[in-house]
Amino acid sequence: MSQLRWWVVSQVLLLIAICSLDHSEGARVCPKIVPGLDKLRVGVDITKLDLLPLFDLGDNGFRSAVADYTCDRGQTAVVDGESFDVPDQVDSVVIESSGQQTSSVTTIKSESQISQALSISAGISVETAKAGFSSSASYAEMQEAITKYGRTVSQMSAVYTTCSANLSPNLLLGQNPLQTLSRLPSDFTADTQGYYDFIKTYGTHYFNKGKLGGMFLFTSETDMSYFQNKNSQQIEATVKATFASILSTETGGSSDESKEVIEFKESSLITSKFFGGQTNLAADGLTKWQPTIAKLPYFMSGTLSTISSLIADTTKRASMELAVKNYLLKAKVANLDRLTYIRLNSWSVGHNELRDLSAQLQNLKTKTIFSDADEKLLQSIEDQVSVPAWFSDRTTFCFRSTAVGSADQCNGQSTNTLCAEPNRYTQQYMDKTYLGDTGCRLVWKISTTESTDWFKSVKVNFRWYPTWSPCACGPVGTPFTISAPANSWTQDYLDVTNPKFGECMLQWMIEVPPTATLWAKNLEFCIDFTCGKKKQCVDANQWTEPYLDISAHEACGMSWALIAK
């Protein structure tokens, strides 16, 4: 049978399917659907999904309906004393009246964590989220806060659930998308624009499960300096206290703010927002706002399925999956182009390479179908400009002190190890070698549980020389240098500086090999010492300015940080 005859037969079968759907002429239209259930039948563009937008302006990612609702079975549910229709396509509805449920604190420190955090807040699987959100306004805002300004984003919410629902596992594609699909050829490459137009109209996914209600969302963008000398438990407690204070204030209450909350607010850009109900009533108190949520609920979270799974024609389903794959790759190109532009304006190393990458991205923007070579090129660009999760999440910079004699000289402990993730300072080490003559043995290390081959050649370098007495740390004016590759401690440096033995000049450097990716070549190493108020950051492969370790008659607080910009 010729290809043309096959096409004619497929169109006839498709028309028969359309006519046989339960939403055909004669099906009962739902006059009054349970509030909020309409969101379950609409498509979602996963690249633009912004379920909890930080700002009111912009595209939230919801698209046209992918399924039709009918009410032939006459199912109903009572919401706030009023009866509403439950569509036949909805498998189950639970009307709830839960009290306030407060989420845990979500902390986003790196660009690689944004999609994961947004997926958790929306109740979406992390696997699905790997390709999602990058074209949304909230993603762009967080990306800029983290990569351009070096801030940490924290989120917390109070949730008031009024309804949860599941769509039928036998859901059928709606009449409008089915008719649009019928006009497309079976081969994606024969009409790529037609498939992309379908995606622009109906999206890439739909929610097969959903939770509706009201929410108060708190978001903070906090300067890195705030986190110095605070552990994770202290930070989380302060974020929770700030959240509670702002929620109380926003709902007409009052709150006595602690000094910790005041300090956090002074170091942060904070936004807060109500979703669902008559939000203008929130200022009059929760008792005014909460009763309005049930009939004006917000779609808060859910579980996604692909629209392609609703396509019965296996050939067209495969073509739609290919179209979605390429559509997601186009979104990835746009995201990397935006990130590369940020890098050009914030990195000090590799501008020529970044311009070359930008030119390659401009070429990729013209693609409608991506080859395997294009995908490999995209991955190589991402490897250069995006800080990977293995570094931001599973790498630490560590310092350890060991007392030779009295622990009083060495932070009050015989052995003391202080570690910090990238973009965090270690807690302060209190240098008190003036209290004795035995001193403290000091070492440093970069640790990671996962890395690429070139990272094994990244080194911590430390050098020192005495200023007037060879007893302090060796011959006067002669620098001593020690270094250690990743996952190894440096050799011991014996710190015996005091008025009796003398003073020493100290310097540090993070050494990154030429084979490293661009993000690594733009690492910074920072020191923050209380004595002399010495605080500075230097690029990789550069020594910090000499620090004069006097250790005379006061303790000196010392902190170190590895910064991925």
Curated annotation (Swiss-Prot):
Please indicate if the UniProt record lists Lipoprotein as a keyword.
yes
Q: Where is this region: Invertebrate MACPF Accessory Domain (IMAD)?
A: 387-565
Q: Name one GO molecular function term.
A: wide pore channel activity
- The source's superkingdom equals Eukaryota
Q: Which Pfam families match?
A: MACPF
Q: Where mainly located?
A: secreted
**How does it get modified after it is made?**
PV2 is a very high density lipoprotein (VHDL). It contains 3.75% of lipids. The major lipid classes are free sterols and phospholipids and also have significant quantities of energy-providing triacylglycerides and free fatty acids.
- Name any Gene Ontology BP term: defense response to virus
Q: What does this protein do?
A: The egg defensive protein perivitellin-2 is a pore-forming two-subunit glycoprotein that affects both the nervous and digestive systems of mammals. In addition, it is a source of both structural and energetic molecules during embryonic development. The tachylectin subunit (31 kDa) binds target membranes while the MACPF subunit (67 kDa) disrupts lipid bilayers forming large pores (inner diameter of about 5.6 nm) altering the plasma membrance conductance.
Subunit architecture = Perivitellin-2 is a dimer of heterodimers held together head-to-tail by non-covalent forces. The heterodimer is composed of the tachylectin subunit (31 kDa) and the MACPF subunit (67 kDa) that are disulfide-linked.
Q: What is this protein called?
A: Perivitellin-2 67 kDa subunit
Q: Which organism is it from?
A: Pomacea maculata (Giant applesnail)
